[in-house]
Amino acid sequence: MIPRLPRYFLKYFIIFTFFCVTFCFLKLCLGENGVEKKNHKTIEAYQYTHTFIHSAYYYPKSKSLGENAVVLVTTMNKRTMWKILDYKINMIGTNQSTHHTTRASLSTEHRIIERCDYMLIIAQTNSIDNMDKLEIEAEGVLVEIPYKKPIYIAPKPVIFCVSPQFAAEQWQTFLVQLHVSKRYGAHLQLYIVSMVESYFNLISEYEKMGLVSIEPWLTIKFSSTDGPYLEPNRNVELRNQAGAHTDCLLKYKESASFIGSLDMDDILIPNNANSYYEEFEREYAGSQFISALHYDKYDYKTIKVSELRSQSLSAIVKNAERLSTKDTGKSFVRPERFNSTWSHWSRAAQKKPIYLDGYEKPILRELKTISNNGMFHLKNMYLTEFNDLGIGQIPLNPTDNVTQLIEREHLAEIDADMKRMLSMPSISKLADSLPKEEFYMPIIFKCYNESFYHLRDTNQMRPDILCVNAYSCDLPQQVGNRCVHSDATYHSGPPMWPISFHFATNSFFSRDIGCYQ
């Protein structure tokens, strides 16, 4: 005879089983103290490496990064592991009452197949309200990272980010770039590695007037390590120019309407527009499908004179001769559409899916190459006596060979403004100290040509074979004409696996280092 079960046994058994299953499920999904336990993908590291943090930004609010965004601009060794972009960095944000740990995703403007071992890596996450402390954590080891907030009021709606200058001496190019940009409504953000002191003093006078912002671009240094490491400056693309351009983009992305990345000798003159803002708005035309505006660079040779009082944009323009070559162009962007950039354009500019409110499917933005304008690239400038200058004509726009490169009225305005400013006592007193002849430029050009220009110009440069870098260029120091060089207080965090982090504070310009990269 089968024994009879107690009354309601089945009901109690079902309830008991339900609670047991629920308890086991919660134990699996929750860690201690009720904190959610996430099953993160394990990334196997190959080696212990070092990363230099150029800058860290905290955005309480952002148009494109979200609230409490944190972004790090770094030079990182991609060979730390097989797929460096799969790695996540634990970041801890702390405010007055609590702390919050998130895992920052990594991205880059470079292709992983490229030869350079070090490359620009962006680390991005969203942290905590009113953050007042930022730390990186790995296996219980912490390092505090200094950070800054972006600029929320831009000097002008258009910002031009100029590539880091090293052993810079051609001050005439700066005057052209500054006065053309000033006339058409752009503010220059300039990064300097090293520069002839008198040239630096000239730029500093323009900085005092609010026409240019100067920032040291630091040589990468690991101040303390517990073993040998691969030298980063020699194994990264051109002093990590992309890092400087990305830093500039992040600095102004909440305040500027347009941001461009260019070299000092890349001169952009609007076509059939009174300002850069007018031209960029016209070319974007309110479209959500345009990622960036891309301008080709047309090479020119022209003259330069050594006397400060004789500087004239008209003389440079009217003695310019178009060369048969073109150089890789530059891009100008709406900053809310990008979080990083390469030196010429962002890798995210072409066919990257973007999800917008009200759209069920992503849109694919594309780079727009400007067909009716290009950059006036001052590729070669030859010293000429002022009295020997010829009187030529304004060159034609290289894209149509019909319109003039610059309107006569605008050229006259810029000349008058340049003459007025160069006659100011604070600037005119620098005339005798500025370089009167070339010293570093021929050396650098020769080294660049031997290192990679000859390969680029013959279409033989393969990024998977050659790391574009000229750190080994031998730069002799010029007697009696010293340079300023970027410097800072360098810091190294504790050893961490697999990456130890290094950074700098209190950057400044030193007169005791010399003209080096």
UniProtKB/Swiss-Prot annotation:
Domain of life: Eukaryota
Gene Ontology terms for molecular function: glycosyltransferase activity
Domain (GT92): residue spans on this chain: 156-454
Pfam families in the record: Glyco_transf_92 (PF01697)
UniProt keyword annotations, A-Z: Glycosyltransferase, Membrane, Transferase, Transmembrane, Transmembrane helix
Listed GO CC annotations: membrane
Subcellular location: Membrane
Residue spans crossing the bilayer: 9-31
EC numbers on record: 2.4.1.-
Membrane topology type: Single-pass membrane protein
InterPro entries recorded: Glyco_transf_92, GTase_92
Keyword Magnesium: no
PANTHER family recorded: GLYCOSYLTRANSFERASE FAMILY 92 PROTEIN, GLYCOSYLTRANSFERASE FAMILY 92 PROTEIN F55C10.4
Name of the protein: Glycosyltransferase family 92 protein F55C10.4
The organism's taxonomic lineage, starting at the top: Eukaryota, Metazoa, Ecdysozoa, Nematoda, Chromadorea
